[in-house]
Amino acid sequence: MSRGLGDVYKRQIIGDEAVPAHNTTPESIEIHQSFAKMVDAGCKAVVMEVSSQGLKLDRTAGIMFDIGVFTNLEPDHIGPNEHESFEDYLNCKAKLFKQCKVGIVNADDKHTKDILRGAICKVESYGIGDNADIKAENIELLHEPGKIGLTYDCTGLVNMKVELNLPGKFSVYNSLCAIAITRHFDVDEEALKETLKHVKVKGRIELVKVSDDFTLMIDYAHNAMALESILTTLKEYHPHRLVCLFGCGGNRSKERRYEMGEVSGKLADLTIITSDNPRFEEPEAIIEDIKTGIAKTTGKHVDITDRKEAIKYAIEHGEPGDIIVLAGKGHEDYQEIKGVKYPMDERVLIKEVLEELKGN
């Protein structure tokens, strides 16, 4: 089935063509122009990420979605350039369920009831708790060289054994969400199980082979909630050391810097603070804010402003059994400095570092 896609990677996929986009959720006229192109390309379904900003600015007004999905919510995107308060953020998210036919929601998230207040759609839920319509039971971790994953039993509206080559409770939730959605498309169970077993998403717990001794991965975790989630998950696999490398974006809330610093300081054995997208701020000033959060903990840290040098330090000092997380950039292939997006892909940086270390 031909499909269309609009997502956080700021791209649109129309049939087999990938088209760059400026926003996660484009302006309304662009959305409908894209829909028209998708119809012309023979697309039968569209999967679209609808951001809180997109809902706030009515970019999706007039669209009735067949399925709307709510995964989770924590304070984020709050500031002078985004939402004035968490209440505004939540209320904007909730607008989605006033313009969809079926709402699929995470039964375990503490904000689900508020998100569904005023909803006009039929509601189905997924989760780990007993009150979910589709739930995961008997979760078991899988860990062997070059592989971090888990298995669980899916029960309720869908019953099957699930295996994932991805770690963590959040991967359980993500897969349950996918199962809940695909139920409405009559997807073959064996095809679904095989897809879940091998699914990989660029920049999301993306394993990169650098050594036979330790594990390195790239992940888009760019706020405290996401960082805490992945670090807590990885600690369950009992690494020799958990090493976290990250920075924070410029011209965004300083609270995020303090919170991420504190989270990494508490959970990681070593934090390597570096640059992310400094935008119009000085990278060193952002690093100092992150260190303010780390100072609330007893966590060890080093700060290396240049991201490539920081990655080199992480690889060069990797110890047997370590898990190293490069957090924050994920799928991004640029670094934004003073209004200019310079090419920068962590996969390329890793390759360059390995070549340099090999040459030495």
Please identify what each model-predicted range represents.
Residues 39-43, 66-216, 291-298:
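Acidic, Mg2+-coordinating active-site environments of NTP-dependent enzymes
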Residues 19-48:
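Conserved nucleotide-sensing/catalytic segment adjacent to the nucleotide-binding pocket
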Residues 54-61:
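Conserved helix/coil segment N-terminal to the catalytic DExD/H
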Residues 43-53, 216-222:
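Switch II (G3) loop of P-loop NTPases
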Residues 120, 157, 177-190, 194, ...:
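ATP-dependent carboxylate-amine ligase
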Residues 62-72, 239-244:
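Inter-motif core of Ras-like GTPase G domains
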Residues 6-23:
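N-terminal phosphate/diphosphate-binding loop that engages ATP/GTP or pyrophosphate donors
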Residues 1-9, 271:
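Single conserved hydrophobic/aromatic residue that forms the stacking wall/gate
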